[in-house]
A protein has these predicted regions:
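Acidic/aromatic-lined carbohydrate-recognition and catalytic surfaces
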Residues: 1-159, 167, 178-212
Length: 212
């Protein structure tokens, strides 16, 4: 994590790690995986509120870019879900962009009896929206709302997020919780073929951008 090692005298927590890396680790490692450094509402950074910003406590984009000039940097793309307290969800409720149709809702006919997931909270949250009753999908927590990849705009948004990270020096990516990306009624909703097609697309984009 960007704030795992820091010096309280420094303004940005990530600088403390970078100093520690230079003194203790650089002769042994040339790749660093920074877990989510975005503004987040829960789950140690995995409930992202804004994919285009860095948590102001952790640092700035320039901290990542400068570190990446001499080291390989790996970052997470938190692709399956987004924060219930972020701009996207606020816009979703208002039918405004960015956020309109970004989150997955299902109706009462959806068969979720076979769903496999690593949590035991209530999966679906009833919501009255757009003059009808729908159910928000929440694989990991009530604060982490699953995104709707049946909306091409969501996929395009994450391609842009990847490109933004590349522009700041990131060369290796981890697609967080990617196995849960696609949902179909009556299935386990994990590792579905549609998910693998999206992974192939990201692999193709990585090859084009010369990143991993």
């Amino acid at each position: 994590y960007g704030d795992s090692v820091f010096n309280s005298k420094q303004k940005y927590q990530i600088k403390g790690f970078q100093n520690f890396y230079q003194k203790k680790l650089k002769n042994y490692f040339n790749t660093v995986h920074f877990l989510p450094f975005y503004p987040s509402s829960s789950d140690s950074g995995f409930a992202v509120k804004d994919h285009y910003k860095i948590d102001s406590r952790i640092g700035k984009w320039s901290n990542i870019s400068n570190f990446a000039k001499k080291n390989d940097v790996m970052a997470d793309i938190v692709i399956n879900h987004s924060s219930a307290r972020g701009l996207w969800f606020r816009n979703f409720l208002r039918e405004k962009k960015p956020g309109k149709n970004y989150f997955l809702t299902v109706n009462s006919k959806f068969n979720a009896s076979k769903v496999v997931r690593p949590r035991d909270h209530e999966l679906l949250k009833k919501i009255n929206i757009f003059k009808k009753t729908e159910y928000l999908w929440r694989t990991f927590s009530p604060d982490q709302l699953d995104l709707n990849f049946k909306n091409p705009a969501v996929l395009l948004r994450f391609i842009k997020i990847m490109i933004n990270l590349v522009n700041h020096g990131v060369t290796i990516f981890r697609l967080d919780a990617i196995a849960y990306l696609w949902k179909e009624s009556g299935t386990k909703c994990i590792n579905l073929k549609q998910t693998h097609e999206i992974i192939k697309l990201f692999r193709l984009i990585c090859s084009f951008l010369n990143v991993k």
